[in-house]
A protein has these predicted regions:
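Conserved P-loop
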Residues: 40-107
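The conserved Walker
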Residues: 35-36
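Phosphate-binding/switch region of NTP-binding enzymes
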Residues: 167-235
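Conserved nucleotide-binding/hydrolysis micro-motifs of P-loop NTPases
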Residues: 63-67, 75, 107-111, 139-141, ...
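Pre-Walker A adenine-sensing motif
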Residues: 8-22
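Structural recognition of the conserved hydrophobic beta-strand(s) that form the central parallel beta-sheet
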Residues: 59, 132-136, 161-171
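Short hydrophobic/aromatic beta-strand immediately N-terminal to the Walker A/P-loop
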Residues: 29-32
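Phosphate-binding/switch loop-helix module in NTP-utilizing enzymes
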Residues: 100-159
């Protein structure tokens, strides 16, 4: 299969049709899930799909080294390429590498100001303007405020990109709303356009749409995360 066919047949095209226009530049999306459901894998799947569509991606992690994040991309790309018998694999891989930047911040060194300055530097000196910005491990939902989410949304507007965040749902101790969303997330929801949940169902993980911008009708998304390959698949 060539890259164009892969893009057309990607399960994430179904996700985009479920949310007319997708997340959209200048907006924040959040994926929720318990430990082990694949929140980071989902972010990487989103990133890889964007890269295969010639979009530049900035992946920021506060809980893993750059080598570890890169290894994760490599593993998922390899599994995807083998699953679809991807043509011209080396050339496509090189394109993915050129269009992706990974920044990691450890020991609580991350601030929005630092990533803003880094993004501006990349734009001015490296001709790198991400269409998608992925945050793995940020913010700390136990401590974050609506003002901090507003600042993240402002960053999405400044960079004219989509921003995806992840949030862990604790098995015990989390206060939840009627949808099962932790209240520590809902207190910032005015700044969140799309909410997704990775729901563990026996031997598979189902993707569930909880919020679609301001739409009162939320579509059923027929996509799962394969726990073996960490790839998105048709349900």
């Amino acid at each position: 299969m060539d890259r164009q066919s892969l893009n057309r047949r990607s399960p994430l095209r179904v996700f985009e049709r479920s949310i007319p226009g997708g997340l959209g530049r200048g907006n924040i999306g959040v994926v929720l899930g318990r430990a082990g459901t694949g929140r980071r894998a989902f972010l990487v799947d989103l990133g890889l799909d964007s890269l295969l569509n010639d979009r530049q991606v900035l992946h920021v992690s506060t809980r893993a080294s750059a080598d570890k994040v890169h290894e994760f991309y490599e593993e998922i790309f390899r599994d995807l390429a083998e699953a679809v018998h991807l043509e011209d694999r080396l050339r496509v891989h090189l394109q993915v590498e050129r269009n992706r930047m990974i920044h990691t911040f450890v020991d609580r060194t991350f601030t929005l100001d630092r990533i803003t300055r880094a993004a501006n530097y990349m734009k001015q000196h490296m001709q790198f303007e991400p269409s998608v910005l992925l945050f793995d491990g940020f913010p700390d939902w136990d401590m974050t405020t609506a003002d901090e989410l507003a600042a993240i949304k402002n960053l999405a507007g400044q960079l004219q990109c989509e921003i995806w965040l992840e949030a862990k749902v604790h098995r015990e101790g989390d206060e939840l709303d009627a949808r099962g969303v932790p209240l520590r997330v809902t207190r910032c929801e005015e700044h969140i356009s799309v909410l997704l949940r990775l729901q563990q169902n026996e031997d598979h993980v189902r993707l569930q749409l909880l919020k679609d911008h301001d739409s009162p009708d939320v579509a059923d998304v027929h996509i799962e995360l394969d726990p073996r390959t960490l790839l998105m698949v048709w349900q």
